[in-house]
Amino acid sequence: ANLVAKSLVAAEVDGPVTRYRLLDTARAYALEKLAGSGELEAVTRRYAEYYRDVFERAETEWETRPATEWLADYGRQIDNLRAALDWAFSPDGDASVGVAMTAAAVPLWMHSSLLDECRTRVERALATIKVGETANARREMKLRAALGASLLYTRGAVPETGAAWTKALKIAESLDDAEYQLRSLWGLWSFHITDGHYRVALAVAQRSCTVAANRSDPNDRLIGEHMVGVLRHYQGDQPGARRHLERVFTNYATADHRSHIMRFQIDLRAGARATLARVLWLQGFPDQATRTAESNIEDARANASSLCSALALAACPIALWTGDLTAAESYVGMLLNRSTRHALPIWHAFGLCHQAALAIKRGDLNTGLWLQHAGFDDLGEAKTGFRFIPYLSDMAEALGRAGQIADGIAAIDEAIERCERTEVHWVMSELLRIKGELLLLQAAPGVAAAAEDHFRQALDWARRQSALSFELCAATSLAQLQSDQGRPADAMALLQSVYHRFTEGFETADLRGAKALLDALQ
């Protein structure tokens, strides 16, 4: 009390336990006295060992305590953790203490979305572990998994990401550790699907189902359902995707500790609902898709990666697809803000790409193209991934509208080639439709016939995938062409046959556009 009264110690009384913190000047004075007494090394070691024990206790409590309560207790220790790790890996420190502390502190970094800090600390710890050192095998497994997760969300599906998850899985199998086998399989699935290797990702998903079959946690068995559902969506099987994703959404058991967020760096329920929102829009339920994406944001707020995923993969694109540009602007701003605050460059790059699409829809083509290039530059090696393809189509449309038709066709051809090579078939209908629209911009003989062929291919793809929204887009483009060619009866019959299958979403941009064309044809 006297030290507090003299302003040498600060008291923190914002919780059930009063905590005391030395002011910087007092801390510097104490360190000087310790050094002078010759006790600094011994005290610093005890300090590091104490916080190693603190975080090992925190690691065991993570899966049993409510997340907010756990974070309130241990989140305030982040500076002590950093200081202890700095000593442990210093020339006068003890790397073995540092390795143990780093492995135990992973839940704190993950839950606090300090992924870049996690990556650098984990890489430092791994550098001190000898290859094949059996005494540290379990800690190395945890560190490899943490490295894979932090790399995935900060740099994307780079080779180092896959290598980290592969090593973690190998160690987990050697230790017969089913928990880390599941985590590593999730990481490898995320790596392969992001990199466009769908068949490999499906094999990983099936393997995860096998491992999870004997687990006591029912949520573990839903991980494979989620994996398969997401794969089905991107491959173009929307009915199949919906079945798997709805099972996850319906059967998921919420727990206060929400340990799955740390285990898989995503809220499983929120992740399934984000993809389900996309499926609903594709199937012709834009209002349901919008409501699903909106409600998902609240569920995902507990974790920055989950929130960025919900925004980038569902809320932003669905707002753009439905033509709600005010909502799109809000979601894009939220995505850019959160990804910047938590140093998540991949999600920030996606935010720039969505911002570009928003500018393009508003007619600001120069800004849109500039933002698109900036987003592509920031994506770096992640441009090889499946999520890059729709952004290429945005660029192709903008280039065409800006009069750079040849460049636009080159961009859409690249998108179609990537789509075919990676089996990202969900967007093939829209790519073919855009190619047809770009062909019509050319003043060359035979372009109308070529465009019509592309529109009909787009219709076929959409119908095979039960993607009613893309079917409407293709039907609208083809009906407009038929109308321009003096074939209003054909145009009316085609467009009515698609438009009248919708039961909602009549105020969205595509349906308003289709209705306006139908009215003009009558």
Task: Report residues per predicted region.
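Specific register positions within alpha-helical solenoid repeats of the TPR/Sel1-like families, i.e.
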Residues: F55-E59, V106, M110, L152, ...
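Start-of-helix signal in alpha-solenoid helical-repeat scaffolds, especially tetratricopeptide repeats
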Residues: Y20, D24, A48, A72-I78, ...
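Short coil/turn linking the two alpha-helices of tandem helical-hairpin repeats
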Residues: E59, D92, V106-W109, E133, ...
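C-terminal non-catalytic interaction modules
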Residues: E160, K170, A410-D413, E417, ...
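Short, well-ordered secondary-structure microsegments
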Residues: T68-E133, M141-T154, Q181-L185, W189-H192, ...
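Short acidic-capped amphipathic helix/loop micro-motif used as an active-site/signal-coupling element
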Residues: T44-T64, L85-A88, V99-A105, R119-K130, ...
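C-terminal boundary/linker of central alpha/beta nucleotide-binding cores
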Residues: A1-S37, E41-E49, F89-V106, R119-E123
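Extended non-membrane alpha-helical scaffolds
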Residues: L152-L169, E173-C419, E423-W426
